[in-house]
Amino acid sequence: SRMCSARMRRVRRFSISLLWLPERKLTAKDRTWIEGALNKQGCVSIECALDKYQDFAMEFYSDGNGNIRYEGLSVFGAEKKGAYSGNVLGEQTYLESFFVENFGDKFQQLKETVGEAIRQIYGNIYTGYLGVDMLVYRNKANGEFAIHPCIEVNMRYTMGMVALRISQKYLAPNARGDMRITYTSKPGEAYEQHCFMKKAYPLEMKDGKIKEGYISLCPVTKETKYRAYILVF
């Protein structure tokens, strides 16, 4: 049997709910989830799960007059159930190195092809940023890397764009790191982690930009459960 996943799109919240189906036969819980999704949204999409290696996205800007501008590459992580966990920070040449090495000219062709598709579909009806989530996976037939060119399109200023702008505006040249979103359910644990990282990775600036170290992107108290932070090395 091949593992599949069902997706329910929640348009207002700009998110996707995932239901993993390890077997073809649906359980009562599976049926309840799918029925609920159909009642709320009218449709679900089902597709075979891939042997994921890396999540990434291409970020664009549409001016609403038929023009699309490529903003950059976003390399990010996701938990097993699909929840976003963070982005890699760094210069575009660093982020693109894996893709250029493994896909060569095909990566540039993909960038151009996706950009043209975005222009035709959204160029005259949408003004703003949008990201196309993609996936590097291993082909089961030969074990080689392949790319799924469109997992979903997010018509908003994505976390990938946030990471892209942080890399461009606030990181020192050649600095690399991670932007992370974490959750801890135990009271006080997030605060303890924050204090530890602040001491273990002291912030070091160069010419007004982050050279290395830890910086929290939100206030952290003893009641905090979610954290957003940058760790540069």
Where are these regions (language model features)?
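A long amphipathic alpha-helix within ATP-dependent nucleotide-binding catalytic cores
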Residues: 29-51, 59, 70, 82-145, ...
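Short, flexible loop/turn elements at secondary-structure junctions
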Residues: 48-50, 62-64, 75-77, 134-138, ...
